[in-house]
């Protein structure tokens, strides 16, 4: 119920029109797992980063903000995990990696090429498990982190 209310409020936020529209479009598309790789690659090819983020968020049951942070982080480890969690194949991940490296000079295409085997070695199930806390509400995630820190102290 809380998530539905937050989505409803986000849809009415004037400052987030593009993001809200991308989320609505991704929901309307309702990409099936076999359609997702092509849609993600095509959205980046068309320079529709907001749609790419929304499609990824929907596929992984993440908030748009979490998915955006993952995609825009120049250290792309979480992105590669997210793409594996969505069960993307080598060709799709390579196309996405190349597109992001071409668009952002901070991303190193040679380093990405060196990582592709390691990326593909991670199973989709292991990637989903590694990212599982990201689908939780941000306040709940923060509370979990505080508990973990308190236990370590």
Spell out what each predicted region is.
Residues 1-153:
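Alpha-helical scaffold segments
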């Amino acid at each position: 119920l809380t998530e539905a209310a937050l989505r409803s409020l986000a849809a009415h936020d004037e400052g987030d029109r593009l993001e809200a529209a991308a989320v609505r479009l991704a929901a309307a598309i309702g990409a099936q797992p076999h359609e997702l790789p092509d849609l993600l690659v095509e959205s980046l090819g068309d320079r529709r980063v907001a749609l790419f983020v929304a499609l990824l968020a929907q596929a992984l049951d993440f908030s748009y903000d979490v998915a955006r942070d993952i995609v825009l982080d120049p250290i792309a480890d979480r992105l590669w995990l997210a793409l594996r969690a969505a069960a993307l194949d080598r060709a799709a991940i390579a196309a996405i990696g190349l597109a992001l490296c071409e668009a952002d000079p901070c991303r190193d295409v040679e380093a990405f090429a060196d990582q592709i085997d390691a990326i593909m070695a991670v199973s989709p199930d292991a990637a989903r498990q590694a990212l599982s806390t990201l689908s939780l509400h941000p306040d709940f995630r923060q509370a979990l982190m505080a508990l973990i820190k308190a236990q370590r102290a």
